[in-house]
């Protein structure tokens, strides 16, 4: 079995990149059946990092592979929402398979401050165990410790210990937040060495084979991808600081790990790993239902590095469609009865420099005065505490924490001056205090109609959230203009460009329908749980079951 898996991996990863042809179109579906007639044997949950609803819809007419299958044969919710304010990778992934918003998962951001942490670095990473000696937010031991609720896989395993729960991803936080604390296997791309897991977890024979295949792929240069016809109009240079973006093809030298990671090659490797894991572990081939979650991280790396509207992002989506098609075809060939859900952890926003070229002259980069060091100096001066550390934050938006060394009187002055200064700043939409957010009821109703403070409440976890929450205005990119640019674009805002994501369900033979009204990613868990007849108490989650049966039947009946 392992030799067969290894051969398949090498075939998938060693083909000349520019010569790969699109996956064949899926065979015509048989007569429609109810998606809920019998429980599927395998749940395949896919997150495409930074796959915004805008990016999904922009190229929808060009899909020929896996995305075409999902959009033409499945249940399509093009207006899904990561409904909270802090639209970052870790909080977003924490919602997908828990049915819970960050206010319940405890994952309020990628990083937050714990000023009582027993180490010098008070900035905590969402997927670390900060109690480990010598750890920091940059050099950490990965852990699901901070996730406060079970995932779908965890609930399935609690109901039936025979259930296999596997999670693979490009990023550790994607694999960990979707897999949960009790997953059987959790793997992520840890660097040039390949896929890794938690400290002390040795590679299985399969993972060793996967990493050998990865090493062989990495050792080959990539001459670049051909430019699809739909990408030709995107092919023009855009200057952002010292960076020029917009015309890339993902060419890289042999051994260039960074180039591999920021390209469609990464997702192709992760999907090859997932397919090999399904075959090797015989997922979906036993009496119980198994689950595999797959975090495809390349779209996010591409979006940050090049923006969302150049050739780079266009090629990335085209390749994603092709690779997903090949992955689904492999599962079909193996005769597995599987259900797919595909969504994203958040959306994204293109770089202001290209927006200004394309009818949006008001697009801006954030004022350097709002960056952490500058903001602390300003507030300290205004509060009569020049040179003192008065606030902690890690960006020009998001949570702000008061220093623990302030007296009550100093803290009051700092809050007064911070609110006065920030609320008067032309790039700031609003600033909420912790008390204001805490007093707001947990939101309900259509996510597209929520107010900003309701979005903030969905991101709020009292023991982790800051004393203030700073939200920038729309069309203000939270990366300042600099002579030397790292990332040129990002996400994380409370606006719909970052909140809206597609949510797509598919199972062989189901009747296609599309529902354009807003739903939430927290609705995914109860919807899948209903298909496998897994009871989930409604008071333990924030989502609702989505009926995936077109017409009068109801896949949520009995939930």
Curated annotation (Swiss-Prot):
Highest rank taxon of the organism: Bacteria
Induction summary: Constitutively expressed.
Subcellular location: Secreted
Cofactor: Zn(2+)
Listed SUPFAM superfamilies: Alkaline phosphatase-like
Residues annotated as signal peptide: 1-19
Bridged cysteine pairs (disulfide): 90-126, 231-314, 545-556
Pfam families: Phosphodiest
Cofactor details (free text): Binds 2 Zn(2+) ions.
Catalytic site positions: 89
Residues reported in the UniProt entry to bind Zn(2+) 2: 300, 304, 491
EC number: 3.1.3.1
Keywords from the UniProt entry: Disulfide bond, Hydrolase, Metal-binding, Phosphoprotein, Secreted, Signal, Zinc
Listed Gene3D superfamilies: 3.30.1360.150, Alkaline Phosphatase, subunit A (3.40.720.10)
Ligand binding (Zn(2+) 1): 49, 89, 345-346
GO CC terms in record: extracellular region
Gene Ontology molecular function: any one: alkaline phosphatase activity
Protein residues bound to substrate: 110, 171-173
Catalyses which reaction(s): a phosphate monoester + H2O = an alcohol + phosphate
CDD domains named in the record: AP-SPAP (cd16016)
InterPro entries on file: Alkaline_phosphatase_core_sf, Alkaline_phosphatase_prok, Phosphodiest/P_Trfase
pH dependence of this protein's activity: Optimum pH is 9.0.
Function in brief: Alkaline phosphatase with broad substrate specificity. Precipitates uranium from alkaline solutions.
Subunit comment: Monomer.
The name this protein goes by in its record: Alkaline phosphatase PhoK
Organism: Sphingomonas sp
Classification lineage: Bacteria, Pseudomonadati, Pseudomonadota, Alphaproteobacteria, Sphingomonadales
């Amino acid at each position: 079995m392992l030799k067969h898996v290894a051969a398949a991996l090498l075939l998938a990863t060693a083909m000349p990149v520019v010569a790969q042809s699109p996956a064949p179109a899926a065979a015509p579906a048989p007569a429609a059946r109810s998606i809920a007639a019998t429980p599927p044997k395998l749940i395949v949950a896919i997150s495409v990092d930074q796959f915004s609803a805008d990016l999904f819809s922009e190229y929808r007419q060009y899909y020929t592979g896996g995305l075409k299958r999902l959009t033409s044969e499945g249940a399509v919710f093009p207006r899904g929402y990561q409904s909270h304010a802090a639209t970052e990778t870790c909080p977003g992934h924490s919602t997908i398979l828990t049915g819970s918003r960050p206010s319940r998962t405890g994952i309020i951001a990628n990083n937050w401050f714990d000023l009582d942490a027993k180490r010098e670095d008070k900035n905590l990473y969402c997927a670390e165990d900060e109690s480990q000696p010598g750890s920091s937010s940059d050099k950490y031991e990965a852990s699901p410790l901070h996730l406060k609720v079970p995932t779908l896989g965890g609930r399935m395993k609690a109901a039936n210990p025979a259930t296999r729960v596997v999670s693979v991803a490009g990023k550790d936080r994607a694999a960990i937040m979707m897999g949960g604390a009790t997953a059987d296997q959790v793997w992520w791309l840890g660097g040039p060495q390949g896929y890794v897991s938690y400290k002390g977890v040795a590679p299985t024979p399969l993972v060793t084979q996967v990493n050998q295949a990865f090493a062989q792929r990495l050792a080959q240069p990539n001459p670049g991808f051909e430019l699809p016809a739909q990408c030709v109009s995107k092919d023009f240079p855009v200057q952002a600081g010292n960076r020029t973006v917009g015309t890339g093809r993902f060419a890289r030298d042999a051994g260039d790990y960074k180039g591999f990671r920021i390209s469609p090659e990464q997702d192709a490797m992760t999907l090859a790993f997932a397919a090999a894991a399904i075959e090797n572990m015989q997922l979906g081939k036993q009496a119980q239902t198994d689950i595999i979650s797959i975090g495809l991280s390349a779209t996010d790396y591409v979006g940050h590095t090049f923006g969302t509207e150049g050739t780079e992002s266009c090629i990335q989506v085209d390749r994603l469609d092709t690779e997903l098609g090949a992955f689904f075809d492999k599962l079909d060939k193996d005769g597995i009865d599987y259900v797919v859900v595909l969504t994203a952890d958040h959306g994204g926003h293109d770089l202001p420099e290209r927006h200004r070229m394309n009818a949006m002259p008001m697009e801006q980069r954030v004022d350097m005065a709002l960056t952490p060091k500058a903001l602390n100096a300003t507030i300290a001066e205004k509060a009569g505490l020049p040179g003192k550390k008065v606030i902690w934050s890690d960006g020009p938006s998001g949570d702000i924490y008061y220093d623990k060394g302030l007296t009550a009187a100093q803290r009051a002055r700092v809050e007064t001056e911070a609110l006065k200064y920030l609320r008067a700043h032309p790039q700031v939409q609003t600033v909420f205090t912790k008390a204001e957010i805490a007093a707001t009821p947990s939101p309900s109703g259509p996510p597209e109609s929520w107010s900003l403070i309701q979005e903030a409440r969905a991101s709020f976890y009292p023991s982790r959230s800051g004393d203030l929450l700073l939200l920038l205005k729309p069309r203000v990119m939270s990366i300042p203009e600099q002579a030397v640019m790292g990332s040129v674009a990002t996400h994380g805002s409370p606006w719909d460009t970052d909140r809206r994501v597609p949510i797509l369900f598919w199972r062989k033979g189901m009747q296609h329908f599309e529902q354009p009204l807003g739903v939430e990613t927290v609705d995914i868990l109860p919807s899948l749980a209903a298909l496998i007849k897994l009871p989930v108490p409604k008071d333990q989650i924030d989502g609702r079951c989505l009926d995936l049966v077109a017409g009068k039947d109801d896949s949520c009946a009995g939930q």
